[in-house]
Amino acid sequence: MGREGTLTIATRGSGGPGEVSVAIRGGRETFIAYSDQPISQNANVLIIESNPSRAVRVVEWPQLDP
């Protein structure tokens, strides 16, 4: 929880999950991503809940410019 990621497959809200890619331990891992509202592919998201089955709940999260 609390990590940022990028959606590689859009979520459809209650219509179904998508997929999120997250930087972990010097590499990238993917997780099934659920959201309350649809979120488009390549959107920056924040993980707000995780489950042992490699599924996470995400919300859209604005990416800050450096």
State where each predicted segment sits.
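Terminal membrane-proximal soluble interaction domains of membrane-associated proteins
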Residues: 1-66
